[in-house]
């Protein structure tokens, strides 16, 4: 459907032409899920160190909501590197390395809550244990980490999430669940990386030892018996995967009683660097974007027709759960940077925070993004030496704040105009006029008086939407080779 644009969006044809061409190029390419980490991507961030991080650190505003992302370690143990498809950094699991890394995370929590103003004893709205395979953490080490976090923060009103592979929720008589349940919280939830129930595909992923349908069913029963909610990640558009197989995965997830189902379109293309991206047969069987979009629409319709609510781009929740405070809050809050700070601990931990000084003029507000070392050894060494492990940082300019707001809002399917104005002090239609016009013409967004809303097509191509909005600024950041102190440098990056 063609969506006409209001007069306020009228621009000269020569201004729109390059934007339209850029959008067409993006729509023809692979559609990644780069919205999870948020703007900017790591490659656009300046190389940092703990001493530099202390200089650019800003005190937190204790009136804002706070979420914590805690990565106990970066280790995993699939039989195939990255399960064939995963682009996130993982290292081969070894128990001694995992234990020593968790000890370093504990040290980081203690050091940073002591050193960073506005952090210690803060009320936490949601905490997410992620990383390599978080539930692969030795249970006693996980319990010690949980106790440290409970001492450093007020978790009594928090949602806690624990991510992992199905089988490790059950090993040692559910010891990791016992440790998880020992952390004070308002609500607890498990996030399982199921990917598929198909035994053939699990073998191709090197995930047969992570548990079959029976194991997954047992985890769901155990979690519900403990008062926890449970979500699963499922992938669609696997090479050569039939519609029947995609639908069957969704049917099984509902039969098993999952409270939330997260549906992910496979990211795979030549040159990606994953094991599957080097397999010509896999690449040859990939659906084109049009087919992949049609498959995603069917998956979305299947869940909506069965009483699920689409909470974000990828997360579908049972309607009766979504209407309560037991809905998935961490993701929801992570997509509202105007009101929420996110602080990360552990290898590859990400923090995006704003300062506690809140002038009436939004143009004077400051924000910074920091990313820790991803390698476990480098992370442990940095913590031992400095009590912090910053590898990259990025100080937001006003234009960057605008991009942070719009790109983080996209996963929530809507950019509220009044919220944007209150956050950055300008009008959405003025700041992104040609981009919004091109996106509306392509039926990717609907331009309503109160908000910009993703269409169903825009949901699937949300990565292209974000890239188009960020393109001009990202191009400028890419072009810089030597920057003055206080600026941001970066090498090539795809987002934008």
Residue ranges and their predicted role:
Residues 426-438:
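Short amphipathic alpha-helical interaction segments
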Residues 129:
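Conserved phosphate-interacting/catalytic interface
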Residues 62-104, 203-204, 208:
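Canonical Radical SAM [4Fe-4S] cluster-binding loop centered on the CxxxCxxC motif
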Residues 459-496:
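Short, amphipathic alpha-helical interaction segments positioned at domain boundaries
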């Amino acid at each position: 459907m063609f969506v006409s644009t209001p007069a306020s969006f009228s621009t000269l044809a020569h201004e729109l032409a390059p934007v339209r061409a850029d959008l067409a190029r993006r729509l023809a390419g692979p559609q990644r899920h780069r919205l999870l980490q948020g703007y900017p991507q790591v490659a656009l961030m300046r190389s940092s160190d703990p001493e530099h991080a202390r200089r650019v650190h800003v005190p937190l505003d204790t009136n804002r909501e706070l979420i914590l992302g805690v990565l106990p370690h970066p280790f995993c143990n699939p039989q195939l590197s990255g399960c064939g498809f995963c682009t996130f950094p993982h290292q081969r699991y070894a128990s001694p390395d995992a234990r020593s890394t968790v000890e370093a995370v504990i040290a980081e929590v203690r050091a940073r809550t002591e050193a960073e103003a506005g952090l210690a004893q803060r009320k936490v709205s949601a905490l997410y244990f992620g990383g390599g395979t978080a539930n692969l953490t030795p249970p006693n080490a996980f319990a010690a980490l949980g106790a440290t976090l409970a001492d450093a923060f007020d978790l009594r009103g928090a949602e806690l999430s624990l991510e992992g592979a199905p089988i490790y929720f059950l090993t040692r008589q559910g010891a990791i669940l016992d440790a998880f349940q020992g952390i004070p919280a308002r609500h607890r939830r498990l996030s399982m990386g199921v990917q598929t129930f198909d035994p053939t595909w699990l073998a191709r992923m090197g995930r047969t030892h992570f548990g079959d349908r029976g194991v997954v069913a047992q985890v769901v029963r155990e979690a519900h018996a403990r008062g926890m909610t449970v979500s699963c990640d499922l992938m669609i558009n696997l090479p050569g995967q039939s519609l029947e197989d995609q639908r069957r995965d969704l049917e099984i997830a509902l039969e098993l009683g999952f409270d939330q189902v997260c549906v992910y379109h496979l990211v795979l293309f030549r040159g990606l660097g994953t094991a599957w991206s080097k397999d010509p047969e896999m690449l040859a069987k990939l659906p084109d974007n049009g087919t992949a979009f049609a498959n995603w629409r069917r998956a979305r319709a299947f869940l909506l027709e069965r009483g699920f609510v689409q909470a974000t781009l990828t997360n579908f929740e049972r309607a009766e759960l979504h209407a309560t405070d037991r809905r998935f809050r961490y993701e929801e809050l992570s997509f509202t940077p105007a009101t929420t700070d996110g602080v990360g601990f552990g290898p590859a931990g990400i923090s995006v925070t704003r300062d506690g000084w809140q002038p009436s003029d939004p143009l004077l507000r400051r924000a910074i993004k920091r990313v820790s070392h991803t390698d476990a050894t480098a992370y442990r060494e940095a913590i031992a030496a400095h009590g912090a492990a910053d590898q990259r940082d990025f100080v937001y300019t006003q234009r960057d704040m605008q991009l942070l707001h719009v790109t983080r809002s996209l996963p929530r399917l809507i950019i509220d105009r009044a919220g944007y104005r209150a956050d950055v002090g300008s009008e959405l239609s003025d700041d992104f006029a040609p981009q919004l016009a091109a996106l509306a013409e392509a039926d990717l967004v609907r331009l309503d008086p109160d908000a910009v809303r993703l269409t169903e097509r825009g949901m699937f191509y949300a990565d292209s939407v974000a890239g188009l909005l960020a393109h001009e600024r990202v191009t400028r950041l890419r072009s810089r080779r030597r920057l003055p102190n206080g600026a941001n440098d970066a090498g090539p990056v795809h987002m934008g």
